[in-house]
Design a protein with these regions (language model features):
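Hydrophobic N-terminal alpha-helices or hydrophobic patches in metabolic proteins across all domains
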Residues: 2-129
Length: 129
C-alpha cells in the first residue's frame, strides 16, 4: 500500500496463500523476493510475499527457501503474463529479500514525495528478523 514503482503505478505483489480471496482483499504480508521486469515505461517489479499471519510460512524469510517448483511456476506465470501485454517487456529474473525490501522502501518514498505528505515511515515491520 502507498507505493509507486518507477513506472508511477502501484507496486505489484503476489502473495503466496492457499485460500481463495477476492478483489480488494487486504492481506498483511512481507516480501521475500521479487521478479524484475522492464517495460517501455521503466521497471515493473513483481514482489513475491508471504502472509504474516499464516504459520505455514513463518519460517520463510527469502525466496530460496520456497519450493523450487513453486518458484518456477510463478516465473512461468509471469512470463506468460508478459507475453499478453501490448508492449515489449524484458524479463530480468529473480532478486532476493534485500532487493525486495529496498524496492518497497523506494516505492513508498516515491509515493509520499508525490503526495507531498511528510512522514517518517518505520520499515522495521518488513523484516521480522
Amino acid at each position: 500500500m502507498n507505493t509507486l514503482d518507477e513506472d508511477h503505478k502501484a507496486l505489484d505483489a503476489l502473495v503466496l496463500i492457499d485460500e481463495p480471496t477476492f478483489p480488494g482483499c487486504i492481506i498483511h504480508a512481507r516480501p521475500i523476493g521479487l521478479f524484475k521486469m522492464f517495460e517501455e515505461e521503466g521497471p515493473d517489479h513483481k514482489l513475491i510475499c508471504i502472509p504474516v499471519e499464516d504459520p505455514r510460512w513463518n519460517k520463510i524469510f527469502n525466496l530460496h527457501q520456497v519450493d523450487a517448483g513453486l518458484v518456477k511456476e510463478i516465473e512461468l506465470f509471469l512470463t506468460a503474463y508478459a507475453r499478453f501485454e501490448d508492449h515489449k517487456m524484458d524479463l530480468e529474473g529473480w532478486e532476493d529479500q534485500n532487493s525486495a525490501l529496498e524496492i518497497v522502501r523506494e516505492a513508498q518514498a516515491r509515493y509520499w514525495e508525490l503526495h507531498s505528505e511528510t512522514v517518517n515511515p518505520d520499515y522495521s515491520s518488513l523484516n521480522p528478523r
